[in-house]
Amino acid sequence: MELVVKSVSPETLKTATLVVAVGEGRKLGAAARQVDELSGGAISAVLKRGDLAGKVGQSLLLHSLPNLKAERVLLVGVGKDEELGDRPFRKIVAGILNTLKGLGGSDAVLALDEIIVKNRDSYGKTRLLAETLVDGEYTFDQFKSQKAEPRALKKITLLTIKAAQAEVQRAVNHATAIANGMAFTRNLGNLPPNICHPTFLGEQAKNLGKEFKDLKVEVLDEKKIKSLGMGSFYAVGQGSAQPPRLIVMQYNGGKKSEKPYALVGKGITFDTGGISLKPGAGMDEMKYDMGGAASVFGTLRAVLELKLPINLVCILACAENMPSGTASRPGDIVTTMSGQTVEILNTDAEGRLVLCDALTYSERFKPQAVIDIATLTGACVVALGAHTSGLLGNNDELIEQLLSAGKAADDRAWQLPLFDEYQEQLDSPFADIANIGGPKAGTITAACFLSRFTKNLNWAHLDIAGTAWTSGGKDKGATGRPVPLLTQYLLDRAKA
């Protein structure tokens, strides 16, 4: 679907549907007043009958109003002035899109520029609107024998004032790239694990490198992983017929003298728990355990599409965690790339085992900041639910930048503590560190484990176990998060 930005009066455009706002108390927005005057008070007459109160979520479709080039006018309730938050605004936009899809028209014009969203300027409001529209077009029916019919809606025009047109266009460009990145992430996450395995993800990286010539891609196989001394990473994949892969993608859009930013993604393409086997109920959703790697793919795609003037390295630690005669066992001790030894007390705490070696590997790029992204702990879902990603790290400035980016992108994170006292839970009598820290503070102790491998890095950890996918029901599937947060962080660094 194409998004177009124009600065014209709404009545001048020929369109299948013109969308205008009505506030609570039947207050007409600026565009609605123009349409009302041209149509001889047609909207006012409808509102006087009580057909629409202007509350959030209400809408009313009018046909063939006089003196208009639009075939239909869709009145949309937007609530009280200056009380509209991000979530209600997104719901309004999603409702508009669903209505437009059902009408069958090929285009629509949205005259909603006068809507006030709390703490949002013209750019921020348009970002939310455009991202919701493009992301709302997402479908995943690759494996359905009967595909959904192609949608008639091909173009939506966003109207704004002349003075804001450049800023609104910038917001649309950013939102479109982010939504495209989210779609890439969602597609990878929704694929079945018999197709989306570590080798497949390596192929996707190479395909991305072919599409974007300024991307350098290297895929390291199991022999290279072993030769690098990544004993922890290698141990996770050794029980599977699908060999592990370390995927390294480098984009150099900034100056050669500038240190890169690094994104490190957990890519467990299916997690049975290994010998520490998970319960069978809901295990199908463990295909989403590569959500961290998928979100790095999506963020990188957005960066490439926007050609951001930054240097970025993306490292994906991809493996399949399976039980077998060759799988690692509880009690095994492995040596990491850093030289530290780890006692594997639970093979289902495997994400940290692949990430620790990937984080050590990232040091060779001398990054100015490293962010790892992982569906790491069920404890994070208990603590924060499905709305907020967990955030921990060793650099206060980096943490604040990520919190700010999450707020700006409406893709929030929340900081959890990383106090030294928690480190004691990882003590092992036989190795330098144990891979689990007991039942308490599971999200924190998982990050404590990773912190042992990031002492030379400005590092942050995003636990997206609750936000990477939606469980069960008709809305089941990958969400595309935290692509908006990560892309916003990089936009801020690029000052784009």
Curated annotation (Swiss-Prot):
As its record notes, the protein acts as a catalyst of:
Release of an N-terminal amino acid, Xaa-|-Yaa-, in which Xaa is preferably Leu, but may be other amino acids including Pro although not Arg or Lys, and Yaa may be Pro. Amino acid amides and methyl esters are also readily hydrolyzed, but rates on arylamides are exceedingly low; Release of an N-terminal amino acid, preferentially leucine, but not glutamic or aspartic acids
Cofactor(s) recorded in Swiss-Prot or TrEMBL = Mn(2+)
Signal peptide interval? none
CDD domains per the UniProt record, alphabetical = Peptidase_M17
EC number(s) recorded for this UniProt protein: 3.4.11.1, 3.4.11.10
Name the residues that bind Mn(2+) 1: 271, 348, 350
Top-level taxon: Bacteria
* Entry's Gene Ontology molecular function annotations: manganese ion binding; metalloaminopeptidase activity
| Gene3D superfamilies referenced in this protein's UniProt entry, alphabetically | Leucine Aminopeptidase, subunit E, domain 1 (3.40.220.10), Zn peptidases (3.40.630.10)
Q: Which residues form a coiled coil?
A: none
Q: Which Pfam families match?
A: Peptidase_M17, Peptidase_M17_N
Q: Write out the entry's keywords from A to Z.
A: Aminopeptidase, Cytoplasm, Hydrolase, Manganese, Metal-binding, Protease
Can you cite an annotated GO cellular component? cytoplasm
Co-factor remark: Binds 2 manganese ions per subunit.
Q: What is its main location?
A: cytoplasm
What InterPro entries is this protein classified in?
Answer: Leucine_aapep/pepB, Macro_dom-like, Peptidase_M17_C, Peptidase_M17_leu_NH2_pept, Peptidase_M17_N
Residues recorded as binding Mn(2+) 2, renumbered to this chain, are 266, 271, 289, 350
Active site per database record:
278, 352
Give the similarity note: Belongs to the peptidase M17 family.
Task performed by this protein? Presumably involved in the processing and regular turnover of intracellular proteins. Catalyzes the removal of unsubstituted N-terminal amino acids from various peptides.
| Name under which the protein is recorded | Probable cytosol aminopeptidase
Q: Corresponding gene? A: pepA
